[in-house]
Amino acid sequence: MVLNKRRIKDGNTIRALISLVFVAALVPHLTFAQDKIIATYTLPDTPIKQFQNALLPGSVANDRKVLLGSIGSDLWHGPKDPRDEFWMITDRGPNGQIAVDGKNRRTFWVPEFDPTIVRVKTEGKAIKILEAIPIVGQSGKPVTGLPNLKDVDEAPYNYSAQELLPLNPNGLDTEGLVRTTAGDFWIGEEYSPSILHVDRTGKVIKRYIPEGLPLEGTDYPVAKVLPVIYGKRKINRGFEGIALSGDEKTLYLVLQSPLLNPDRKTGEASRNSRVLVFDIPSEKVTAEYVYRFDVSKEFDPNPKNTPDEMKLSGVIAMNPTTLLVLERTDLVAKLYSVDLSQATNILGSKWNDAKTAPTLEALADPATAGVRVLPKTLVLDLSSIKGMPEKIEGIALLDQNTLAVSNDNDFDSEESKYDAEGNNIGKGKISQILMISLAKPLPLQQSAVAKISEPR
């Protein structure tokens, strides 16, 4: 480089050149704040038979060597909970699929398994279970995780798919979890889909299901108050996430996948899922919004990824109009902030009528039909953080700088592989809680921490 003699005599120019050289030398050594995992905790190996029989004596005769898992279906940290304690929940139990004559059959490794709420402590490198609450009906009998209705749910089979199991109207596929300051629980459930109210002992107080669903003979009260259109949910894709408002009067529920409306082909190709708002005092749905998924191949470039692999899981109520929503595939997970105040409330509209054509799920762009979807802002790309496991489902905020997440390991049994004795052959997938230090603090008000928003 040749410098002009006149300019090199300029003291300001010389100082600027020296500064540039100094900064260039520093760049390789500079570090920038990054989102990172600061602690990881793992659930120790515990046989299901040992775990459940301690709670419900004699309920499990053979667990087929399946270990307790899937407690990370959701993660709750209440405002008064110790920093190292969380509430978690299993799903319906270890299950899988086996093809018979070209058709998949839903298998249940341990049909007696009972969905359970657990209070845990992160200690050392382990998830320590402090308390376990099995979910039971009004009679005190376990609800189990078996499907409810013929032609509505999948038919249940035993581990080998050779024996048809009985349906159970009480059965629950529990997923989302919140806990009130009074100690009772609200749960998002996938079979109906339904909202479940459970007392502090695990007894079902009431189950809220879609209108028109022929669910009878349950061991607990049932209220048919949800929009009838929700009866078109894709099997195993019901209410995956649930959030609670700060005044504990409002629930927010996310539907894991678009409804199969009007049919399976349309639903599995759709990008339009739904968010439901439920008023606890009146026991009524008060609002409904459209959540639009990202384009699947842009979100997760995995060759096996299709629009049907896009899902919603955890959700946190930041304030009365803002939710933090976990959008994911099995491999990629991102947190988005969505604004309810800027979206169309479609409750009671033609989009809840099965006769409407085209359906909401069929719309390539809901805006062309006058529907404003929830505006999304990316908050955190979890999959960009080194060490993040697959299938993140639970999220909880400890403070504006710290996020806790949990994964669902599917009881390490989803491959449906078994040995000569009929025992599970797993891959060693584990259940974890991970603490994440956020590079950019979230602008939270104190009441938003731990999934709680400001009172209205």
Regions found by a protein language model. Give the residues of each.
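N-terminal secretory signal peptides that target proteins for export/translocation
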Residues: 1-14
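Short, aromatic- and cysteine-enriched interfacial helices/patches
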Residues: 3, 30-32
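Intrinsically disordered, low-complexity serine/threonine-rich segments
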Residues: 7, 22-25, 73, 456
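Bacterial N-terminal signal peptides
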Residues: 16-29
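Sequence/structural signature of beta-propeller domains
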Residues: 32-456
